[in-house]
């Protein structure tokens, strides 16, 4: 995923958290807000452990989001918040992201 798709500014995060809507799955909470482009941010708190663990979780979330990027049909700012637990896997994040994107109607499957 290129840097063009990353939500980086504090102002953007605040607007998504204040004005956005939320969807919930087993291991992820998704906060989203309509925008002019597709961007994703990741909010991993210190409750998840040290910096190594937090960065691993963010890498897994980024990779999961990257796999759905071609299928997203609408422009939104997304913020993914993982729930605190012991272990995380890429397959679990992908499964939960697919559920959230289908529940929110974000996927545009061209088949």
Model-derived segments and their meaning:
Residues 1-111:
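Positively charged, solvent-exposed patches that mediate nucleic-acid binding
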């Amino acid at each position: 995923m290129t840097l063009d798709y990353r939500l980086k500014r504090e102002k953007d995060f605040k607007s998504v958290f204040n004005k956005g809507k939320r969807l919930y799955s087993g291991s992820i909470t998704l906060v989203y807000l309509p925008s002019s482009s597709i961007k994703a941010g990741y909010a991993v708190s210190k409750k998840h452990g040290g910096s190594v663990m937090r960065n691993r979780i963010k890498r897994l979330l980024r990779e999961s989001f990257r796999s759905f990027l071609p299928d997203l049909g609408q422009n939104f700012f997304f913020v993914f918040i993982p729930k605190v637990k012991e272990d995380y896997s890429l397959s679990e994040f992908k499964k939960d992201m697919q559920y959230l994107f289908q529940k929110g109607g974000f996927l545009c499957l061209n088949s």
